[in-house]
Amino acid sequence: MGCNSSSEAKQSDKIDRTLYDEKKSQEREIKLLLLGSGDSGKSTIAKQMRYIHTKGFSNEEIATFVEIMHSNVLSSIQILIRNVPVEQLGSDLKDKANYYSSINPYELPLTPDIGLEIDRLWKNEAIQKLFSTNRAELNLPEVTAYCLDQVERISSETYTPTQEDVLRCRQRTTGMKETQFNVEDIKFRLIDVGGQKNERRKWMHYFEDVKSIIFCVALGDYDMNLVEDETINRMEDSLKLWNDIVNNPFFKNTSFVLFLNKNDIFREKIKKIPLVDYFPDYQGGYNYEKGIEYIRNKFFSSVPTATTIVAHVTTATDTENITIVFDAVRRNIIQSILKLHY
């Protein structure tokens, strides 16, 4: 009987030690939720974390981006040729335009010969004019010019995606993708979930144990509408989504980080497209700094008084920028956790 008691005691001690170790491990783990509307740059931030804080992507993973970049090329040129009168392209391109207008961009292999044909279409004067004047109305992917300018390289038989290709390529996030990495003995779990409206109902499944929410908004989206609902302005959608999240009682003890993203696009766009046309109460004209301040204040105005929040102006495709910003974010998150929980 004494032996049984001794055995049970050892087993109990082992269980207690396991539970203690698990608790200590959880204390050194920070779960971050990456939220925002579709095309806000969330997934690019997640990919940057892979490059900055891990060994990046394996050769097998890099290979999967070939097909994604190919589909980016084909879907981009397809949107353009579907929206330009065929007669403006000239008789030598008419048949090619009709063909690429009808294909499935996710199924057609991008061969070198097809790449040359797409390059000719892209450089056509009518296509270039349409791109420069109507890209917002057409909801063109931001990767359009990047991939079409380099279609010869991307369609090469020996093409291997570069780090910039991986960061810039457009792939819609569905469901959940988790990126894990360690910084100074702290394990971070970054949860990226789809931002389109039909994906948002799934978000609540990932709310448990979230220490901080990183919310991405695309600054340059103020003149664009949602792909999934062309009656809704993208910036207005982001503001509503932010309001719903930041005022959710579930997150009363959660810190928030606001990424005012795609700063590079906004810097150029505000010089040409008046912000006041979409937000009548804006009074800063074409001034970049005043535009940033206005949008930041729009988001901050709905934040509860007790909520811990910091904002950063970011360009998700700029690795140096994201490295510096995330280092500051990491420190702020840890300080917020200590303040809220200890």
UniProtKB/Swiss-Prot annotation:
GO MF term (any one): metal ion binding
Annotated stretches, region: G5 motif: 314-319
SUPFAM superfamilies: P-loop containing nucleoside triphosphate hydrolases, Transducin (alpha subunit), insertion domain
Residues binding Mg(2+): S43, T173
InterPro entries: Gprotein_alpha_su, GproteinA_insert, P-loop_NTPase
UniProt keyword terms in alphabetical order: GTP-binding, Lipoprotein, Magnesium, Metal-binding, Myristate, Nucleotide-binding, Palmitate, Transducer
Residues lipid-modified (N-myristoyl glycine): G2
Pfam families: G-alpha
Function (record text): Guanine nucleotide-binding proteins (G proteins) are involved as modulators or transducers in various transmembrane signaling systems. G alpha-9 antagonizes broad chemotactic response. It functions rapidly following receptor stimulation to negatively regulate PI3K/PTEN, adenylyl cyclase, and guanylyl cyclase pathways.
Subunit note: G proteins are composed of 3 units; alpha, beta and gamma. The alpha chain contains the guanine nucleotide binding site.
Family to which the UniProt record says this protein belongs: Belongs to the G-alpha family.
Protein name: Guanine nucleotide-binding protein alpha-9 subunit
Organism of provenance: Dictyostelium discoideum
